[in-house]
Amino acid sequence: MDLVLEFCDSYFFDYVYATLLPASLSPKMGGTWQQAMIKEQMVNATRVFGRSLERPLEVYGYAPFMFEVSPHAFGSVLPRYSLLRQSLSLFLVTTVFGWLLYLIVASFSYVFVFDKSVFNHPRYLKNQMSMEIKQGLGAIPYMAVMTVPWFLLELHGYSHLYMGLELNVRGYVRLALEALFFILFTDFGIYLLHRWLHWPAVYKVLHKKHHKWLVCTPFASHAFHPIDGYLQSLPYHLFPMLFPLHKVSYLVLFTFVNVWTVMIHDGEYLSNDPVINGAACHTVHHLYFNYNYGQFTTLWDRLGGSYREPDHELFDSNLKKDKAVWEQQIKEVDEMIKNVEGPADDRVYER
């Protein structure tokens, strides 16, 4: 995350902090503030010195990495290495980029990929897409708050993220293996967490908000309880704390994860692949609840006995919107709702 933060600091935050909280305010802010800042500088300097004995400087905010430092970088009472500034900046970056990525990818999917016959499905909710967007946009800032501590750990050198790379076959193979391991590790972690979220007591408190959508639009991808979304993101943050991962790969994979999350909610069933947990598998999960908990592959569902092969009608452009097929889905869906949520269904359907 240091690459993103340095870019944002260089082109935006340095100027903003220097303008709103200039260094000239320091004498006016009292001894307590100055003592706190001096203490933080001493603690950070000690930490940097201690680590520099064993490995290169990894604590963000003391030395530039990619960009030239402008005068604004030293013009605020909150320098780049300030935990308060880093926390605020990371929250803003995570929230704004989260919103943009969600809206751009989901909108692209809606226009170019999404099968709009879903709107005619008997279990499509009244005003569903607007509710999905409202829920998604509302969840992202809360998720950002909970995610900031992980990014702070990365900024202060507590992860295994690295930047150098051998520009040869060995280096590229390493990147590929890291990405593959990332997918397998996070897929397993999400499988366990997702299955736990379906325990009745947990489901009703956290995960039910996401299962409000029985048939989905791309905007359902991030429409969940913020704690639910945060918990399912934990494997992505835990991985670089345990295993090496290139910093650029980290950013690419995080972007891919968000794109993939939209794709499995787009209702376009391109392939009935026995390995990939695509949109068809995830549609089965939303319709029938207790199957296909995985995010990327069917591996852990197969091993855990929770895999359900998508109905062949989903892959036929005519049959998947056939009224008889929908009626059969409704029977099983309604029975599953009673078993999982109880006899009262608080959803308001379009039809």
From Swiss-Prot:
Reaction catalysed by this enzyme: a Delta(7)-sterol + 2 Fe(II)-[cytochrome b5] + O2 + 2 H(+) = a Delta(5),Delta(7)-sterol + 2 Fe(III)-[cytochrome b5] + 2 H2O
Localization (cell): Endoplasmic reticulum membrane
Cofactor: Fe cation
GO CC list: endoplasmic reticulum lumen; endoplasmic reticulum membrane; membrane
Enzyme Commission numbers on file: 1.14.19.20
Domain of life: Eukaryota
Keyword Cell division included in the entry's annotation: no
TM annotation in the entry: 88-108, 136-156, 173-193, 237-257
InterPro entries for this protein: Fatty_acid_hydroxylase, Sterol_Desaturase_Related
Domain remark from Swiss-Prot or TrEMBL: The histidine box domains may contain the active site and/or be involved in metal ion binding.
Family: Belongs to the sterol desaturase family.
Gene source species: Eremothecium gossypii (strain ATCC 10895 / CBS 109.51 / FGSC 9923 / NRRL Y-1056) (Yeast)
GO MF annotations, alphabetized: C-5 sterol desaturase activity; delta7-sterol 5(6)-desaturase activity; iron ion binding
Any Pfam family: FA_hydroxylase
Histidine box-2 (motif): residue ranges: 207-211
The protein's name: Delta(7)-sterol 5(6)-desaturase
Pathway stated in the Swiss-Prot or TrEMBL entry: Steroid metabolism; ergosterol biosynthesis; ergosterol from zymosterol: step 3/5
Motif, Histidine box-3: chain positions: 282-286
Domain Fatty acid hydroxylase: 180-305
Main function: May contribute to the regulation of ergosterol biosynthesis.
Membrane topology field: Multi-pass membrane protein
Record motif Histidine box-1, residues: 194-198
Keywords tagged on the record: Endoplasmic reticulum, Iron, Lipid biosynthesis, Lipid metabolism, Membrane, Oxidoreductase, Steroid biosynthesis, Steroid metabolism, Sterol biosynthesis, Sterol metabolism, Transmembrane, Transmembrane helix
Example GO biological process: sterol biosynthetic process
